[in-house]
Amino acid sequence: MTTLGTPYSPHATKVMLLGSGELGKEVLIALQRLGVETIAVDRYENAPGQQVAHHARTITMSDPAQLKALIEAEKPDLVVPEIEAIATPMLEELEAAGVVTVIPTARAARLTMDREGIRRLAAETLGLATSPYRFCDSQQELQAAIDGTDGQPAIGFPCVVKPVMSSSGKGQSKLDGPDDVAKAWDYAMAGGRVSHGRVIVEGFIDFDYEITQLTVRAKGADGQVQTHFCDPIGHIQQSGDYVESWQPHPMHPAALQKSRDIAKAVTDDLGGLGLFGVELFVKGEQVWFSEVSPRPHDTGLVTLATQWQSEFELHARAILGLPVDASLRNPGASAVIYGGQDAEGLVFDGVDEALAVPGTDLRLFGKPESFVKRRMGVALARAQDVEQARTNAKLAAGKVKPRKP
């Protein structure tokens, strides 16, 4: 039996989120609906999740001393990483000492904090199909990996270069020829977060489409961990950042089964409880592993319109040891609303027109500062079929006009 407490009481169930952006905000809301006392942590004040949490804390989460001091002061029952740029060795230390439980595990947080740990796990430990890849510490090493002059098979062109640690496509670029190498290296160095000076270069896979397979590890009625799969989510990315997603994405049954087999292999190894976003490339019946996030995924925002329990509710329930329902309610789609400018305190025109589009909803994230390509909101649409939902979501998103006041 799972027992939950009352916020602000001595018996409160306390959950701390490390990272409080738009995804964390929805997780916090889902936790609060279950009576959980929430602590939203971020690197800047008034982050979206901090606006709705019981407590807001601002620290440098990649600083081990600051992270340790905060966890020891707040004494949460669970620590839930929502971003990559965290001092994960400190989380491992605190978890090993029995100070706190990390979701899904501190090891999973460390392995997925950058592209190297999880790629080596998937390809080298689990033997899963991935694109050909190499890790490089200099522009010279990058050039050698592409050319094959490092004694290994050439990655060749086209290829994709990404910082070992970055998010939302920052620092990622596609290279079509030798003239792109220097630009790609410089762009990756500018876009990386913590592990400066190291990139992954991947051979380009000629895939038909890419999906996110949301995978949930949750306790069943017998107390044992069970794996649940949401319907596959299709999405379109531009420069590594999602701009549109929809659910369900039609797949060949064999490809769907392979996708779920891969997702289960990775999430079983990472362990713990919670929702994972497993990214996969698909061509016909072939499936390649790309990446995994041990937390709700940005493309999964569509589940706010499509599932009985959104990815955020699934995550909240799973980490609390509660049963989950990952089934689809109806087809739907999401479309991103960008800030379109560098400014603080934007206002949004056209909200009424957007919500007049049939079957639509909006999430405006409340980010205090906008950039040209910063995701400031998302339009959601549900419909009888995916194509209509995609049309309506894009139409609604286009009617929202962010501007300076």
From Swiss-Prot:
Catalysed reactions, semicolon-separated: N(1)-(5-phospho-beta-D-ribosyl)glycinamide + formate + ATP = N(2)-formyl-N(1)-(5-phospho-beta-D-ribosyl)glycinamide + ADP + phosphate + H(+)
UniProt binding sites for Mg(2+): 279, 291
Enzyme Commission designation: 6.3.1.21
SUPFAM superfamilies linked to this entry: Glutathione synthetase ATP-binding domain-like (SSF56059), PreATP-grasp domain (SSF52440), Rudiment single hybrid motif (SSF51246)
Residues annotated to bind N(1)-(5-phospho-beta-D-ribosyl)glycinamide: 22-23, 82, 298, 367, 374-375
Cleaved signal peptide residues: none
InterPro entries: ATP-grasp, ATP-grasp_carboxylate-amine, ATP_grasp_subdomain_1, PreATP-grasp_dom_sf, PurT, PurT/PurK_preATP-grasp, PurT_C, Rudment_hybrid_motif
MF terms in GO: ATP binding; magnesium ion binding; phosphoribosylglycinamide formyltransferase 2 activity; phosphoribosylglycinamide formyltransferase activity
Residue ranges annotated for the ATP-grasp domain, each copy included: 120-320
Keyword set, alphabetical order: ATP-binding, Ligase, Magnesium, Metal-binding, Nucleotide-binding, Purine biosynthesis
Domain of life: Bacteria
Gene3D superfamilies (alphabetical): 3.40.50.20, ATP-grasp fold, A domain, ATP-grasp fold, B domain
Gene Ontology cellular component list: cytosol
Swiss-Prot/TrEMBL GO biological process terms: 'de novo' IMP biosynthetic process
Enzymatic class: ligase
Binding residue positions for ATP: 115, 162, 167-172, 202-205, 210
PROSITE patterns hit by this protein: ATP_GRASP (PS50975)
Pfam families reported in the protein's UniProt record: ATP-grasp (PF02222), PurT_C (PF21244), RS_preATP-grasp-like (PF22660)
NCBIfam families, A to Z: PRK09288.1, purT
Protein family (similarity comment): Belongs to the PurK/PurT family.
Quaternary structure annotation from Swiss-Prot or TrEMBL: Homodimer.
Record-given protein name: Formate-dependent phosphoribosylglycinamide formyltransferase
Species in which this protein is naturally found: Delftia acidovorans (strain DSM 14801 / SPH-1)
Gene: purT
